[in-house]
């Protein structure tokens, strides 16, 4: 099956469905008699939701940690946000789970630095079962799309758990496979729209932290998910000009679309602006994962003033032009202004 059948259209072009939609429509019509009425994901926007006041954040002793391997928080009835336990991975990535009438999208699948005895697939299946019970659906009728924001192992290490799961498609581990999964032909500028079944996710490229990275905008909650390109932690800028270009694309998008929250994939900062050391497995006073468009703008403006290697706090994130193994300041296009 053409992977692009779950895309509605290229957002920069005329709204013409891609190949495979006709077959999908026939299948939907045949099963309409037994399916409940579709959920309306496009009225009364943005769909209201909330983040928890405190996420699971590790413990002084990982050996004595009693929290579940993954915390599941329902932002609203059709959106779950998962977070990996820091006792299993000090990266503790977040993983949005978006539900539509036909498909479910899982973004970022966690890491296995400290322990690998965690069943992400089982937890995702539990979430799908719960959503289907609430909405009168058959879990087998929903296709699961397993994707990630970028090519770092803390975002895809658990993808293999889904390899033999029925009715599932997952993103490959090369740049070409990532871009091809979304049917893109002009990365990173091109926007494509993923149709989950009445719920649209807008996707485009956001390189800079790494070459292969995407931004995801959920039209239902109006949350902009930025992965590691912009998050409450150490934003390692490996490629300065692509990063500035990506930040400009994010801001341009926010200028023309309503955005309730900007959300990254990690939290590595305390509420007081403390930079938690790399590899720490206990962060008792974490800052919230959600950010604002204004904080995105402030970080973009701040980055243009950086002229020396170091780590710079914008008030929201740490901009790192000297990573753990690579200094990249000489690539900052603003260095000699």
Model-derived features with residue positions:
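A general structural motif
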Residues: 102, 140-143, 167-168, 257-259, ...
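Active-site HxH/HxHxD metal-binding segment of metal-dependent hydrolases
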Residues: 112-196
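Metallo-beta-lactamase
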Residues: 104, 111-113, 200, 205-207, ...
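Hydrophobic/aromatic beta-strand patches that form the interior of the parallel beta-sheet core
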Residues: 80, 145-147, 171, 204, ...
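Short, hydrophobic/aromatic-rich segments at coil-to-beta transitions
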Residues: 76-81, 191, 200-202
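Conserved beta-strand hairpin/beta-sheet module of binuclear metal-dependent hydrolase folds
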Residues: 68-134, 216-229
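N-terminal export signals
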Residues: 5-30
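Accessory terminal helices/loops
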Residues: 34-59, 248, 252-337
